[in-house]
Amino acid sequence: MMSILKNDWAPLLQEEFQKPYYVKLRQFLKEEYRTKTIYPDMHDIFNALHYTPYANVKVVILGQDPYHGPNQAHGLSFSVKPGVALPPSLLNIFKELQDDLGCYIPNNGYLLKWAKQGVLLLNTVLTVRRGEANSHKGKGWEYFTDRVIELVNEKREPVVFILWGRHAQAKKALITNEHHYIIEAPHPSPFSAARGFFGSRPFSKTNAFLQQTGREPIDWQIENI
């Protein structure tokens, strides 16, 4: 798995791959992928890092663990592969985006366009068993993704951290540099979206901050395929 990181994340995370927790995690994953259906595909596990090099990170949207239905997860938080129905949380994200910036709701939930503009779509756990949410929680991924968050926190350029829901907000302790901008709201899930996710306007707030700090705003519109 080490050779998967081909960009500037590789030297930054090199030490993590040698640590005892990761060696143990890798053994666990080998067995899981061999004996069960695990999402995403093995070659998609690190896509958040692959599509958004460290130097390019301007925004972080933290998710929990990958979608656990067939053909959904592909390594970017909240995103689904083209041709797959929009999960309810993602539909709510698009509804808020429509209210916030007037973007139309697209016919797909493939968020690669965001990743390529510097939006790090990071789950805190990078794998899951089919049909079993949180099944790979506590197996070691949290150490790895905490390190990713710490590395982004070390960036000199201000970064926007979008933390939806309690699970993501628990990572706030890792964001210690005051020049970063933290946006918090309830999770976009149907269970909590009406409690303050709708109307929170994270996309316009992010773009206003990026422009204030001299960077290009994000083009949030995901186009129809």
From Swiss-Prot:
CDD domains from the UniProt entry: UDG-F1-like
This protein's UniProt keywords: Cytoplasm, DNA damage, DNA repair, Hydrolase
Domain of life of the source: Bacteria
A biological process term (GO) from this entry: base-excision repair, AP site formation via deaminated base removal
Subcellular location: Cytoplasm
Transmembrane segments: none
GO MF annotation: an example: uracil DNA N-glycosylase activity
EC annotation from Swiss-Prot or TrEMBL: 3.2.2.27
Catalytic reaction(s) noted: Hydrolyzes single-stranded DNA or mismatched double-stranded DNA and polynucleotides, releasing free uracil
Broad enzyme group: hydrolase
Residues the record marks as active site: D65 (proton acceptor)
SUPFAM superfamilies linked to this entry: Uracil-DNA glycosylase-like
GO cellular component terms, A-Z: cytoplasm
Family: Belongs to the uracil-DNA glycosylase (UDG) superfamily. UNG family.
Function of the protein: Excises uracil residues from the DNA which can arise as a result of misincorporation of dUMP residues by DNA polymerase or due to deamination of cytosine.
Protein name in UniProt: Uracil-DNA glycosylase
